Amino acid sequence: MSADPTAPLDAGPELAALLELARTAAAAGAAVLAGRNTAGLDVSNKGDSGDWVTAFDLAAETAVRNVITAARPFDTITGEEGGTVLPASPSGYRWSVDPLDGTTNFIRNIVYYGTSVAVADPDGVWQAGVVNAPALGRTYYASRGNGAWLEEQGRRTQLFGPAAGRTGQILATGFSYDPAVRAEQAAGLGSLMDGFADVRRLGSAALDLCLVADGTHDAYGERGLNEHDFAAGALIAEEAGCWVRRPRLTSPLAGGPSDDERLSAWTCAATLELSGKFPL
């Protein structure tokens, strides 16, 4: 008798298998990015000025999808470039993939970019997430209830977020490609920075969240993100013990989210003491 593809996974070994698959898939995407060469970028614009896509975005997403589909053919995959693909008999599990978070950085050879892969269970709860940053030589990962981890130069380190109350606290944020939205964000930056010593804008939401998890940033907050931008990084920050706010966006399975819904929603991560710094 064959296994029911819609049956829920067991919490223990099956969760470990999900994380391992996420790691393998993210590594496949990152391997594509590691082959970066200027001649092969093939850059085009997706609409908003500065919202770029390259041949590497597309190839990395294909690599990630191939790994996931080979192992779990009944899972749904939502990717930044390829949208949502439903299998004939969906298991209820859904993967969220950003093959190249930080495309502008990648084009300009700025090292803050990577492949982000996360998976949610049939209830929509994120279970495992990985951000693989090949130019940094870092892989951040987490599974629900098992902490957040960094692998770098063969060493594995558990992450516990930033130290509370330290001096010189740094806020990370980002800005929209849309000039009108960006002007609003810039106008509110002064009040958002109240109490922080400095601000950073790295250009990769996934890595900003991971840098809160590893204690580099004290806080990160940005509105207007897509699910694939925050899915893995938010889980990693959460499992590192950080306070995290994810947008409550309409699922891609229900045709969402709308631009208005997305642009009004904040994604945040910080120590609990800094949670009140961000708009509701």
Region locations from a protein language model:
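Oxyanion/phosphate-interacting regions
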Residues: 1-24, 183, 187-194, 207-280
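Active-site-adjacent structural elements in enzyme catalytic cores
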Residues: 70, 78, 85-151, 235-238
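Short, Asp-centered acidic motifs that coordinate Mg2+ and/or phosphate
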Residues: 76, 128, 170, 218-219
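N-terminal subdomain of lithium-sensitive/metallo-dependent phosphomonoesterases centered on the IMPase/IPPase/PAP
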Residues: 1-100
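Short secondary-structure junctions
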Residues: 40-44, 196-200, 243-245
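Conserved beta-strand termini and adjacent loop/short-helix elements that scaffold enzyme active sites
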Residues: 46, 80, 202-204, 247
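Residue-level signal for inorganic ion chemistry
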Residues: 29-33, 57, 68, 103, ...
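Acidic beta-strand-loop-alpha-helix segment within the catalytic core
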Residues: 118-209, 252, 257-280
